[in-house]
Design a protein with these regions (language model features):
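Hinge/capping helix and adjacent helix->loop/strand transition within the periplasmic-binding protein
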Residues: 1-61, 110, 123-156
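Short helices/loops that flank or line small-molecule/ion binding pockets
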Residues: 42, 46, 60-70, 74, ...
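Conserved beta-strand segments of alpha/beta enzyme cores
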Residues: 26, 50-52, 91, 163, ...
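An extracytoplasmic/periplasmic, membrane-proximal ligand-sensing/linker region
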Residues: 46-47, 86, 134-195
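Short beta-strand and adjacent tight-turn residues that come in two discontinuous sequence segments
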Residues: 56, 75-76, 95, 120, ...
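Paired acidic/hydrophobic, glycine-rich loop segments that form the ligand-binding mouth/hinge
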Residues: 26, 72-76, 92-94, 183-184
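C-terminal lobe and pocket-closing loops
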Residues: 9, 81-149, 178-181
Length: 195
């Protein structure tokens, strides 16, 4: 997302500006190694641009600086910034999911905005200790699915900018492994090391 008063109104305009002046536009994230940071690196790689990346200690101070005009852009969890987007304080240039987010239907997906095949989605799941009996896992999953399908709970998540998705434990495990592979590739590419 970017500050609402930026002259670039679309992702392609923002990318063109970044290509015309490599390293001059700023882009914040919520901290080194966060989902936002890794998504940001994937975006820069996919778009073929160089931004002056600034790692903050969380999304809140970054969005404050964005709204204050001290930053050109930032990547963060869309649900965390939904209030600012919906209030028109910042402009969403794209969402990183394959589908538009119901809370802000006018914000295009990365693919719609001109980044074919780009998708990077953070998600939450329920985990249990290793060795938990499969029947307990299945009961926990059934309860979670039932809760997420409850209309009021489902709508509350959508209104907050979340996209509730249900699935099986096997699907969650497959998704986890696929995400670890994709994120591992970007971690290796940028040379990120634990400290």
């Amino acid at each position: 997302m970017c500050i609402r008063d930026r002259p670039e109104k679309t992702l392609q305009q923002f990318i063109a500006k970044a290509r015309a002046a490599p390293g001059t536009l700023t882009s914040a994230n919520a901290g080194i190694g966060t989902q936002a940071h890794l998504t940001q690196m994937m975006f820069l790689n996919s778009a073929g641009i160089d931004l002056n990346v600034i790692a903050y200690k969380g999304g809140a101070p970054a969005v404050n600086d964005l709204m204050g005009g001290h930053l050109d852009s930032m990547i963060d969890n869309a649900a965390a910034q939904a209030g600012y987007i919906n209030a028109g304080k910042v402009r969403g240039l794209f969402v990183t999911s394959k589908y538009r987010v119901a809370a802000y239907p006018d914000v295009p997906t990365a693919e719609e905005a001109g980044l074919p095949g780009f998708s990077a989605v953070g998600w939450f799941g329920l985990a249990a200790p290793k060795g938990t009996p499969p029947e307990i896992i299945d009961r926990l999953n059934a309860a979670l699915v039932q809760g997420l399908k409850e209309p009021a709970a489902h709508q509350r998540l959508i209104d907050a900018g979340w996209v509730p998705v249900v699935g099986s434990p096997a699907e969650a495990q497959a998704r986890t492994l696929a995400d670890l592979d994709a994120l591992g590739q970007i971690v290796r590419k940028i040379g990120l090391q634990p400290n």
